[in-house]
Amino acid sequence: MRKGHVLLGLAVLTTAVRGAAAQTPQLPLNTLNEVSAALRACWVPPPLDQSRAGMQITVQMSFRRNGELFGHPRITFESAGASDDERLAYRVAVAKMIKRCAPLPFSNALGNALAGRPFTIRLIDHRKLREAGNVP
């Protein structure tokens, strides 16, 4: 396995989701932008005491035509300088995001176009930066 690429284990993906403030998409998704927006709506960053200001994490995954996850998601980037505990907290948050959202409600056209192809999304935790007034 190459440096910077971490496979999310099945144990992390089956982590229980409790009290999620995120929304699961309801309407059929027709575009890649809608897929990104749906995944971001399902993402809940780690608690502030486990987070890092400006933390970025990128995950690559593939879907089946019906919106189910195909294979295992892979972390392809994490902010430099994050501690192992911070990285783990964000990996768990990504796994919970996927668990909340999957399967995604793809339209037939989007499902046919996206099936089996890599889909990458970057998530950025701006919460502490917003509090400091550094992000709009």
Task: Describe every region a protein language model picked out.
Residues M1-L8:
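Bacterial N-terminal signal peptides that target proteins for export
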Residues A16-G19:
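N-terminal signal peptide c-region/cleavage motif recognized by signal peptidases
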Residues A22-P28:
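A short, highly charged nucleic-acid-interacting micro-segment common to nuclease
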Residues Q23, S36-V44, Q60, R64-G81, ...:
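Conserved "boundary/linchpin" sites in short secondary-structure elements
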Residues D49-G54:
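Short loop/turn motifs at secondary-structure junctions and domain boundaries
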Residues S79-R91:
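A short, polar/charged loop-to-alpha-helix boundary motif
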